[in-house]
Amino acid sequence: MKVETMNWITEVVRPRIKTLFKRETPENLWVKCPETGQMVFHKEVEAHDFVIPGSEHHLRMSAQQRLKMMFDQGTWLDVPLPEAPVDPLKFRDEKRYVDRLKDARAKTGMADAFKVGFGRVGGLPMTLAVQDFGFMGGSLGMAAGEAFVRGAETALDKRTPYVLFAASGGARMQEGILSLMQMPRTTVAVRRLNRARLPYIVVLTNPTTGGVTASYAMLGDVHLAEPGALIGFAGPRVIEQTIREKLPDGFQRAEYLREHGMIDQVVHRRDLKATVARLCGLLMQAPAATPAPASAAAQPVPA
């Protein structure tokens, strides 16, 4: 009898007590800083636009979060994006390409790696295109190429600056030559913006590599980058294995590229909106320069 009572206590009562007082803890309650190992509340990180307080490490953002951060509240409209053929090569590696697309869409809630929005940034009309690294590494395929071109066409139609937030591992291998074809297509779209004298500003985020770096991500009128962003064609490990030499510290990082003239400015995420708005305001004011009268030229410039 005593044994049966003990079994009932251990097998029935104790588990129920544990269940009664168990608190469900969300999996994303804490965020660990990749640099320092510091544990921070997810809500606190989100409130700081996904920058770790203290270390200032910039975490990746989704396209939706990026657009929400940049656009003035209540001014943002999604730009409808054209559909592209799905898996024209019937590609399969360890998994069918159509299944990879299905998984990525379920994970991100996006149709593909690009999201384009039209609205106001700092009061200025602007067209923004954002790559989401969470969708198959932000890879460039036919749908992404179509989205970039549609964003450029929107900027041309509405006479606004075009601002790109790049985040990609490069061309999408599952689409082969059809993916590589997007490199010249997007380059032509940038050329159309240039001929229309509309600013094209690129913000390089972590990481921006491969065919994206070899095309539209390096064709901007102004190139900004977030701190610590990896920017290059091939990754540092591939380069080291190829040349069999140790690369310099910080090689291919935003700060290194800034020091060597590859980009114009490294901008903290909290300052991006104001910086982009200021640049676009300056570049959109492009009246023809007229020589000042001689009398006016002699007057001192007011402080």
Swiss-Prot record:
The keyword Nucleotide-binding applies. Its EC number is 2.1.3.15. Pfam families: Carboxyl_trans. One of its GO terms (cellular component) is acetate CoA-transferase complex. Its main location: cytoplasm. Keywords: ATP-binding, Cytoplasm, Fatty acid biosynthesis, Fatty acid metabolism, Lipid biosynthesis, Lipid metabolism, Nucleotide-binding, Transferase. GO terms for biological process: fatty acid biosynthetic process; malonyl-CoA biosynthetic process. Acetyl-CoA carboxylase is a heterohexamer composed of biotin carboxyl carrier protein (AccB), biotin carboxylase (AccC) and two subunits each of ACCase subunit alpha (AccA) and ACCase subunit beta (AccD). Component of the acetyl coenzyme A carboxylase (ACC) complex. Biotin carboxylase (BC) catalyzes the carboxylation of biotin on its carrier protein (BCCP) and then the CO(2) group is transferred by the transcarboxylase to acetyl-CoA to form malonyl-CoA. Belongs to the AccD/PCCB family. This is Acetyl-coenzyme A carboxylase carboxyl transferase subunit beta. It comes from Methylobacterium sp. (strain 4-46). The lineage of its organism: Bacteria, Pseudomonadati, Pseudomonadota, Alphaproteobacteria, Hyphomicrobiales.
